[in-house]
Amino acid sequence: MTHFAQAEPASLSHAATLETIFAPASGQGRSAVAIVRVSGPKAGFLLGALAGYCPEPRRATLAILHDPENGEALDEALVLWFPGPKSFTGEDCAEFHVHGGRAVMAGLLAALGRFEQVRPAEPGEFTRRALLNGKLDLAEVEGLADMIEAETEWQRRQALRQMRGALSRQAEMWRQALLEALSLAEAEIDFSDEADVPPETSRRVAALIEPVLADLRAELGQARAGERIREGLSIVIMGPPNAGKSTLLNALARREVAIVSEIAGTTRDLIEVHLDLKGCAVVLTDTAGLRDNADKIEQIGIARAYERGREADLVLWLSEAEAPVAPPENLGMEVWPVFTKADRVEPLENREGLAISATSGLHLGRLVEAIADFAGKLAPSGHAGLITRARHRQAFERAAAALDRCIREASPVELLAEDLRLAAQALLSLTGRIETEEILGEIFARFCIGK
């Protein structure tokens, strides 16, 4: 063990400028174990003040925590010491693993909060410090946020890949190729009297940027796959009144989400349910029944139903098996006829669509399997591409547009260099090295306090 007096702040560059922050790093409420994380120049001091000593780095050690104000024992806990820069934030960090009772946590947090230049952390502040200290880049931070929010197996896999730097590494490889091409162009600017790019330089630049442009286009071609995995596949249930839309929603959700009634017009607004369908996140939306003689309020719901249907990845068009209704035209890219209340009629033959009964469960499993297969084609779980957010897609589009100009247009060497510079900057923005504070604030606001 290391005596507390020997534990000086390892991150001395931050000691004079940064406050020390603390926060629970585990969930709210009572639990067997709770964790409080501390980061900043006073982390070692706080560890010594409460535990009486500073343990060996990165080794869990049993200690009795005392309130420095009155010396009263707070809890028997495991404490850990992470001297910077070898820590999550890059600063001196400490962790207190205590019993998860509310009184224990309240006592520990109160004791920490009484020290000067020590304050509770803001949402995402630990991760923000990791970003500022170069421990993570912005794409990895986004992957970490997605990992915390992941609810399905596909989301977990994609988030882990992002968190481990898949996008960052690939973007940097592309950027290095563009920087090499840029150096060739700038050499021509510095050492040539010609206004246009010499043929030899043009060929060498093209050899560097054409593979990058091809890769960017390939990623943009499957851009929606990654976003679907992260945000969820949009499936909208539509059809005439009393077709069983709300009953199907409740059956797939396995709980009473929507009111089911024989009275037409019961559902007047959109009702959304988030589901885990065989590892794929799905946003299932129930809509108002479509009919001509609707009142004004119901008409608003019908208009919203059409709008959501046109935006959906998949529309399930429901109508009764005894009285099938064809779906309207231009409803969406993918529309499946689904015939409901099929347990009341003879088996349907020679009819395109799937016959089910949401009440009895007849063929409901087939519908789920069909949706899962459809989701797998839209968003393959093995490799969904690097793009998981609109921000990524926009950066790829800016880079691709600039490189396309480089190849298609016989521009003066100065314009060629500028387009190469724009493409490289677009790729650099993926890792956050030139991002604005506004974008950072939006991302970190979604983090929990202790992260």
Curated annotation (Swiss-Prot):
One term of GO molecular function: ATP hydrolysis activity
Subcellular location: Cytoplasm
Pfam families linked: MMR_HSR1 (PF01926), MnmE_helical (PF12631), TrmE_N (PF10396)
GO cellular component, one term: cytoplasm
Biological processes, Gene Ontology terms: tRNA methylation; tRNA wobble uridine modification
Chain segments annotated as coiled-coil in the UniProt record: none
Enzyme class: hydrolase
UniProt key word tRNA processing: yes
Statement: the UniProt record of this protein carries the keyword Cytoplasm: yes
Binding positions (K(+)): N242, S261, I263, T266
Cofactors named for this entry: K(+)
Quaternary structure note: Homodimer. Heterotetramer of two MnmE and two MnmG subunits.
The name this protein goes by in its record: tRNA modification GTPase MnmE
Organism, scientific name: Beijerinckia indica subsp. indica (strain ATCC 9039 / DSM 1715 / NCIMB 8712)
